[in-house]
Amino acid sequence: MLPFKNKITELFGIQYPIIQAGMIWASGWRLASAVSNAGGLGILGAGSMYPEVLKEHIQKCKAATDKPFGVNLPLLYPDIDKHIRTIIEEEVKIVFTSAGNPATWTAHLKQHGITVVHVVSSSKFAIKAQQAGCDAVVAEGFEAGGHNGREETT
């Protein structure tokens, strides 16, 4: 098959522009590594994980794939600093943030060579993510699962 090249494949170093959602309770290392091994971008859903559980999932994902994968991290959690420390220590290269202000952690993550993508529910929040230095955004509609915005039209 011919290589598929676009901004998404180039940004993440993946074969296909397919990004698996970082779903709380569902996106563990098995799913993320399978998606990454298939040429997409697997994402660990860290929202339901304590930092030590996240570390275990990252290590198992690394053992199961040599392809890029990321972590989805809701920013509203109380132990966010511990999660971020784990991500940095485990040398995760891609982080999707959501449910919070990306300006709080984006610069810190980028200082460690991490590509940062923020999930937004409106153009207003996309502009804020851009101003915070995020590398990309995911536009999420009201119909989306998880933490979504108050915009009822998408």
Annotated model-derived regions:
Residues M1-T154:
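Active-site entrance/lid segments in N-terminal catalytic domains of soluble metabolic enzymes
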